[in-house]
């Protein structure tokens, strides 16, 4: 179970290990408004604002709150996915290659995570 500050540090550690040249992340948080079965598992946003005549971009990563109690490999898969969007905006071949570079078991973990979420939706909370 990672709390907000631990989630930020966890994400920063992965970013520093694999994406040192990517833009900085300004905010990482759990978001209870993300409905994981109908929509996304996490969200990434780039917010642009004008400050003092300059355009400033801020990157944010939001992870569905359900992952606060998820097995760590499932959380890692979500964080890797959202970090990959810092470099690749679309879900294309380069995006998935980057995900697999950061987490070699990415595809298996994505599959297992979706099975776990389906199990939760059926009211079964044991893995």
Where are these regions (language model features)?
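Active-site-proximal or metal-binding-adjacent scaffold patches in catalytic folds
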Residues: 1-76, 86-127
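Walker B catalytic acidic pair
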Residues: 82
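Walker B beta-strand of ABC/ABC-like P-loop ATPase nucleotide-binding domains
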Residues: 79
